[in-house]
Amino acid sequence: TRLGPKWENKTGYGLAADGMAELDDVVGKVLKKLDELKIADNTIIVFTSDNGPEIFTWPDGGNTPFKGEKGTTWEGGMRVPGLARWPRVIKPGTVVNDIMSNEDWLPTFLAAAGDPDVKAKLTSGMKAGDRTFRVHLDGYNFMPFFKGEQAEGPRQEIFYFDDNASLNALRVNDWKIQFKIMEGNIASALLKPLNMPQVINLRQDPFERFPSESQMYFRWVGDKLWTFVPAQAIVGQFIATFNEFPPSQKSGSCSVDQVLDQLQTTPATGK
């Protein structure tokens, strides 16, 4: 993080706090400009983040009450604040506990701009400019929910991928099923495949403490084995979309596996 000179040591609490102070100032300037242009009432404002805080660089990194941090698939790595202002659509002061992903903003914004069917159009082929795109969007259109036309948001599930594109967990409503867990911080975390998926009810255990701290956890989870069946079906349906809509490019990776794969598939030059 590179701060403006006037913000260095501004708060006395380190780089993260100084950065937040500068960010607050920048956001204020943007909102003020919208007012000056008299377009604030016709502008959707979203304030969110791409990942959880980076605990291992504290006090320069952020903080969170949730387990884990950036780069892990515990809640501390995946949950982020989400604030939205949409005059005459979202009622001020509304608090929403529904699941939402940043992937959902694209179809929502396009619906607000007049195209609520873009997701369906893209699956059959949609021309934009001089190109035709045929892709599968994982996002949902939240426009009807924001307008009060639906009691609940359209997203019931979310998939937890780590920074090496490994699918580690699935959440459906309150239930989180972990297939792999990451122990340690983003720099040293070890990915551990589990012999039996780990079940967490995030309403009962939002900080994911019970599997490692409660002596009654295994007795409790014995009554929750039914969750494995719907979880398997949902993951299977999601993976099946890759048959018709394969990824357009390989994911980035910090592991040696992708490097070895590249070495094995790259033709020798003979030099």
For each predicted feature, which ranges?
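Short, solvent-exposed turn/loop segments enriched in Gly/Ser/Thr/Pro and often Arg
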Residues: T1, F47-P53, Y160-N164, F242-V256
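Extended hydrophobic/aromatic segments used for targeting, binding, or gating
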Residues: P5-V26, P193, I200, F207-S212
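Soluble non-cytosolic domains of exported or imported proteins
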Residues: K10, G14-D24, V96-E103, H136, ...
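Beta-strand elements within well-structured catalytic alpha/beta cores of enzymes
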Residues: M20, V27, I44-S49, G82, ...
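Sec-exported extracytoplasmic/periplasmic mature domains
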Residues: G28, K32-I39, L110-D115, K147, ...
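Long, internal low-complexity/basic segments
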Residues: I177-Q178, E183-G184, A189-Q198, L202-K271
